[in-house]
């Protein structure tokens, strides 16, 4: 009996030991997965391959506009290729980063790298840019190119650094034309009573009042809806601007007044530009200028193409001859003096002289 009891106790102890071992095995945590070792040279390569800077470029026009196309197809491509990817360009359109004024303010503050903007909204920053708000200043694109790429354009560019800006290149917004939903406009008298959306610019407002309309300043992002709801009757812009924004869907009548030629400035934040090595600055400037020539070409080709498309879609295009534009020109002649009072008569006289040279 004693031996039997000892055997039972021994067997029980052995069973307990086995069970305890099994339980402990179940509780043992699994080993963590082995992480692949990142070699020091791989870390260094990743660091070297990361972009040195992301250049965000803002613009207010639509995605299919020639300016946006040129930014993507030329400027972005050239900068990224020439810098071996050290600089990456991101293009924003349709006022995604704010309108021209807000984008320019961001450049001055150093919170945005670049923007392509019309000169008209910038007169509050640099009054001399008002020379480009003189109605019927340039007879054609050739004259505009000569002025922007010559001494006047250089003089305007030299004013920018003191405002916290660097003008990389002159691009083209284009000749501004009238659209409206009410009637055909062939003579100034046809403008009477029409409510026309303009930019927030004193000289543009003065010109449209002089021609007999009721100008109403409004942000570009609000224009389509305002036209659709008949809050305003019409607007004025270069053809690529209003075609790519589908303005002709709510404004059937287009008159090629060509009352103002609007340049684009490709501006860069001086605060940010000053941190970029000289070699890379040169690449960025050269890319902006090459892309600018491409943009001008695209813009001019698009103007003719889009007017034809508008007619095919049922719109009415009134193409004014130089002779037919004269009554509009005569009514707005007083704006020359208004601009001279703001920027100085010497600058306006220099501008006239350069235009005369370009016409020869």
Predicted regions mapped to residue ranges:
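C-terminal motif of bacterial Sec signal peptides marking the signal peptidase cleavage site
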Residues: 18-21
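N-terminal secretory/targeting leader peptides
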Residues: 23-34, 46-143, 152, 160-360
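Bacterial N-terminal signal peptides that target proteins for export
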Residues: 1-9
